[in-house]
């Protein structure tokens, strides 16, 4: 993600972010069963968050910080990985060229972290019951600039009909104006533009396209919040997270079902997940970690902005638009409290046999050794989701007998294949 406070004089221990004790219990963190070395990844992220004294993409908007030469003497720029943010071959102008082309060795965008955000990360990691009380000030003009360059340049415009290149024409003035409005409380979120794309089954999936300024601010807020929630999310959570792509989720799933004692599998699908996220519950979950009232008001604005379809505005009482920059983080926070912590506790306290889980966004697979555990967990999952306004899709959620002798056992019982 993008960064802020590239030239902050505040040390990690002197960050303006403060915190107070909360009372939410936290389940134990699970190490993902993949081929990735978690300790090396953690050291890399620490270095990224600690990187300071540099503007976005290693450049300064003044002459104080010199441009980094192309030959970096073998030193790789430190950055936190991002997923699915490709670059276009064209650029708005030569003055914006370098910032949009700086890349890491793995091809992901170069995004240095500020000391302030490093302090947020350390505070959140040190005590997962702390509520952080001062977060909005981390959304600086520099972070907004970085967030702008994280956006897809060819993305369709929202209700403002403004493209990335339109905004780039008067970039500096507009970023400064946007920054001022955010901190004066004058920023207003625009409704999402409703559009539809076809689904594999022939039905249409609704998408919400945010206005360009809303995308910028959402990207900045996501950067700040990821410093908190990446310390909280459990090891079996994948999807729309730094370094946790679908390929790593599949790797973890393969290891889980081949190396563990798995005889039964719940293959689950949540019906209309993003369209049914409860605003009330989501804000309660966010308040477990965020005590900054201004940041909470900002996060609530995007939930209440509504949607515009064919020029007609309608309110949104539940759900968050698929396609919005902030929605994947909202979804992961929601399922962290509704599913992840619950199933992690359930398998430790109630399961008779071994239980393994891999979740990718709103899709998840749970493996069981015991059939009784699988059937009981599925029944309790339905009740758990109903409490928070969610539902397991009755046609797409399956309980599957699995394993080396599964087919033989089904044949003996006269059962049909799954």
Feature locations, PLM:
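Conserved polymerase palm-domain catalytic core
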Residues: 174-177, 181-196, 200, 224, ...
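Sequence-level motif detector for i,i+2 pairs with an aromatic at +2
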Residues: 115, 127-130, 146, 192, ...
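Conserved phosphate-binding loops in nucleotide/dinucleotide-binding enzymes
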Residues: 206-207, 211
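Duplex nucleic acid-engaging cores and interfaces of nucleic-acid transaction enzymes
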Residues: 212-222
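Non-catalytic, polymerase-adjacent accessory regions of viral genome-replication enzymes
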Residues: 1-172
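Short alpha-helical scaffolding segments that buttress acidic/His motifs in well-ordered protein cores
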Residues: 147-151, 220, 298-303
């Amino acid at each position: 993600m993008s960064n802020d406070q590239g030239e902050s004089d505040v040390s990690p221990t002197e960050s303006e972010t403060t915190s107070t004790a909360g009372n939410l219990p936290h389940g134990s963190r699970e190490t993902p069963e993949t081929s990735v070395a978690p300790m090396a990844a953690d050291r890399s992220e620490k270095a990224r968050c600690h990187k300071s004294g540099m503007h976005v993409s290693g450049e300064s908007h003044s002459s104080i910080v010199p441009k980094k030469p192309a030959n970096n003497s073998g030193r790789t720029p430190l950055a936190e990985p991002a997923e699915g943010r490709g670059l276009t071959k064209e650029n708005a102008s030569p003055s914006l060229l370098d910032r949009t082309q700086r890349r890491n060795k793995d091809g992901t965008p170069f995004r240095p972290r500020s000391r302030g955000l490093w302090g947020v990360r350390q505070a959140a990691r040190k005590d997962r019951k702390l509520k952080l009380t001062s977060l909005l000030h981390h959304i600086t003009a520099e972070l907004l600039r970085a967030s702008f360059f994280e956006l897809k340049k060819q993305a369709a415009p929202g209700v403002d009909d403004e493209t990335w290149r339109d905004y780039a024409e008067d970039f500096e003035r507009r970023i400064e104006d946007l920054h001022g409005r955010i901190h004066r409380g004058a920023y207003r979120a625009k409704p999402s533009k409703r559009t539809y794309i076809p689904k594999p089954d022939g039905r249409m999936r609704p998408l919400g396209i945010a206005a360009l300024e809303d995308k910028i601010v959402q990207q900045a807020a996501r950067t700040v919040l990821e410093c908190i929630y990446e310390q909280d999310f459990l090891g079996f959570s994948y999807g729309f997270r730094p370094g946790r792509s679908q390929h790593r989720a599949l790797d973890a799933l393969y290891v889980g079902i081949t190396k563990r004692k798995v005889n039964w599998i719940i293959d689950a699908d949540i019906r209309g997940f993003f369209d049914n996220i409860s605003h009330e519950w989501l804000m309660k979950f966010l308040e477990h970690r965020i005590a900054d009232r201004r940041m909470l008001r900002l996060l609530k604005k995007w939930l209440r902005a509504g949607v515009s379809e064919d020029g007609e505005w309608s309110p949104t009482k539940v759900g968050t638009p698929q396609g919005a920059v902030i929605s994947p983080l909202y979804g992961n926070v929601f399922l962290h409290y509704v599913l992840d912590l619950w199933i992690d506790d359930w398998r430790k306290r109630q399961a008779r046999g071994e239980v393994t889980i891999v979740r990718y966004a709103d899709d998840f697979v749970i493996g069981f050794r015991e059939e009784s555990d699988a059937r009981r967990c599925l029944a309790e999952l339905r009740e758990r989701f109903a409490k928070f306004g969610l539902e397991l899709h009755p046609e797409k959620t399956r309980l599957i007998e699995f394993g080396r002798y599964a087919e033989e056992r089904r044949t003996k019982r006269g059962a049909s294949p799954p």
